[in-house]
């Protein structure tokens, strides 16, 4: 080691030693793997009706309200306001702004007001890597990762990540989720006052969480308005909370969220007005017929020309555990019962086994140990095929099913792509 150091001094290579750390840093920036700022981030599922209004908003896998929002979907005025408030030199620095850091350090050492020296890029690093940056070592790592992030990704990609990760109080992250939760709007629909109010939150999301009765938040909004010479609107803000998020069309929304566990925005063909009419109609129908033992009902409304589902109510009351209201009756498996009888008669007609006036016996009969009865508990003896079908007699239908040639009822259903059929022997006939 002494010989090597002697050669370095003798040849003058010592002058190049300061360049080695810089070269190592450049090599690390260029060659070290750098994950995308939103890689591995989970998002909420948002179900919309056919007008674009939200029906349901779910939590992300890590229990956050976080809605993926593209930078192009955020108004330019809102972007410029955030840059002005958070990082004026975002588009000119390499990820770290030494002047801001120096100014923040001087203010802190001088006992003045604590100032933030972190750039938007540094904030994205802290949020995406879940860093605690209170210690010097962690702050240095944050700065290095910010430089690396700027090396590998564009400014717009980093800014988009910020708008998806910034904290807005509680478990609400990102401007898209904040706009929806607090104002029931998309970012593009926010007023100037609403955008300005949300812009204040990420710097102190605990104390500045938006609510109608948060004095810290109200004071921050007032100070911003004064600082901007009254350019923000003065109309009082109507602020909502997570408890006010919509919970509409619960059965179909639950099904869609189960299918799309990675989140994202899904637009359905549901009509909000028709959906409410169907739900109200089912509740009224079940109430009117409760005396007859009817406790529950389900309905599916399909627009025939387009085959689009316009309304779906899986039960009379989703929240009523007594009727298992959370179970979707439109999807629950159950016996088709008498709905198969017209198919049996149609096949028998096609195969020349009967005509409408063919007499069929409606009398007690056993089919491999099964003794069918009729809904009225009686048998009518000889009846025409037309009358047997019209009055839904069971023995004539089973007799015809046994007489069918090719295709039989089972083969007919299989050709029609009826799902979940068991083997033919399972059904006996």
List each language-model region with its residue ranges:
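Short loop/turn microsegments at loop-to-beta-strand junctions
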Residues: 42-44, 296-299
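Conserved catalytic neighborhood of penicillin-recognizing serine enzymes
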Residues: 107-134, 247, 251, 255-258, ...
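Active-site SXXK
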Residues: 81-83, 278, 306-307, 328-360, ...
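Juxtamembrane regions of bacterial inner-membrane/periplasmic proteins
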Residues: 2-291, 308-310, 363
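Short, well-structured active-site flanking segments
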Residues: 91-100, 173-176, 323, 349-367, ...
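A short, polar/charged loop-to-alpha-helix boundary motif
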Residues: 66-71, 317-331
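Glycine-rich, acidic and aromatic/proline-enriched surface loops and short helix-turn segments
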Residues: 126-130, 164-171, 188, 192-204, ...
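Active-site-proximal helix/loop microenvironment
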Residues: 183, 214, 420-429
